[in-house]
Amino acid sequence: VDHRLKDNDKIVLEGNHILYAIETPGHSLGEISYIFEDAFFIGDSIPVKGDIPIYVDKNKILESLDKIKSTKNEIQYFYPAWDKTYTTENIEKVIKDAEEIVNEIDQAAIIALKENNDVEVTLKRICQILNKPMLEKHPLFIKTVYAHILSEKN
């Protein structure tokens, strides 16, 4: 690594094209996304309905969703790492769905923590509330749940 990128850093490419680095933490703490002309390469920044929500910081993922949403007037295409390409027309709906996922887990965490303060019991109860018992042992989903538990305890 010659240079560690930070928010709004510019990389000048051949032909004077500019690639912008945009910090979008949440899925991982140091996540960087990239804007190139009218395209935003957003990596794993948006939890997607029907997939396992994976992020390590609840507040940061929500901030990153807001940051992505704020670009919708300048960006035509949003390219996630795994899901289909989003457009200006559907990005708000995709982000709204992602916010609902985060809020649903958050509400489950609040309920579970009121019932019991033990982390293991709380994890199991959150999975029950979400009707996703199969995720109880999933190591990456456990990190997502811990992000909510830590947020509620702080």
Predicted ranges, named:
Residues 70-76, 84-154:
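Accessory terminal helices/loops
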Residues 18-106:
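Metallo-beta-lactamase
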Residues 1-14:
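Active-site HxH/HxHxD metal-binding segment of metal-dependent hydrolases
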Residues 14, 51, 112:
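Short, flexible active-site loop motifs that bind/organize anionic cofactors or intermediates
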Residues 4, 36, 53-54, 123, ...:
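Generic low-polarity alpha-helical segments
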